[in-house]
Amino acid sequence: DAPTRLRTAAIYMQDQIKFGQGWTALAGLRYEKSRQRQDDHVKNTSATQHDSDVTGMAGIVYEFTPGWSVYASYSQSFLPQMGQDYHGNAFKPETGTQWEAGTKYARDGWTASAAVFDLRKRNIAAADPVNDGYKVLVGEQRARGLELEAAAELKNGLKFTGAYAYTKTEVTRSTNAREIGQPLNYTPRHALTVWSNWRLPQMPALTLGAGVRYVGKQHGNSAFYLPAYTVMDASVSYTHTNWRLTAGVKNLFNRSYYAGAVRTGVVSPGMPRNFNVTLKYFF
């Protein structure tokens, strides 16, 4: 009932420079423009929107000892949005900025990284609380947090990987004053993934894998939360000269959990125990 046509075009340039002892700098610019037209056959209205923006990014890395470095980066984003509100106005593009700083280590089979970030997004389209089936732009959202990752290759064919994310979110500007200061819906504050592989010494072609996924409590709205959950996965793979066969199972113990929700009373159950088989051929 409301077909939309969106056209975008962009051009960008980027440069990386190494200088001094262990320093690397990266910078770039991107120009993007968009044209959107939507015809609402129900309300007999049309809207055309032209948008353009120049975004930039910059980063610097310093390797202060072999395999160990620190870095900082800044980036901007520009994302055209399809659709229009109840009054027939086309949506403005979503824009954002992100700061990130951290450290990375990679040496002798060990890798690790730690990073802090601060992300802000503006002109976010969300469900219209008054007119069902429509969306409105709600202002600004902010996400700050910490990300940790590590991997290690040990003796006897063992390999471990792990990742943890702490994310604090909030609505910083909104057309609905009650939303300001509230966390974003369906964004867990804590998330953890751990995975291990074991290549059998007696059968090097055979690899066993197992891991755990944890997702913390998620804010639905002022009325409810989705509870935290933990699920376990496992796999077995056989590798030949130029192919690999893998069989896996997700949610090994068939735990019931909720992965998301549309609104109060309409939640999405997580996937029950499920199996998959993949075959990869290497050229």
Name every feature range the model reports, one short phrase each.
Residues 22-25, 67-70, 109-113, 157-160, ...:
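Repeated loop/turn-to-beta-strand initiation elements of outer-membrane beta-barrel proteins
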Residues 118, 137-221, 253-256, 278-282:
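Gram-negative outer-membrane beta-barrel transporters
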Residues 214-221, 237-283:
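C-terminal beta-signal and adjacent terminal beta-strands/loops
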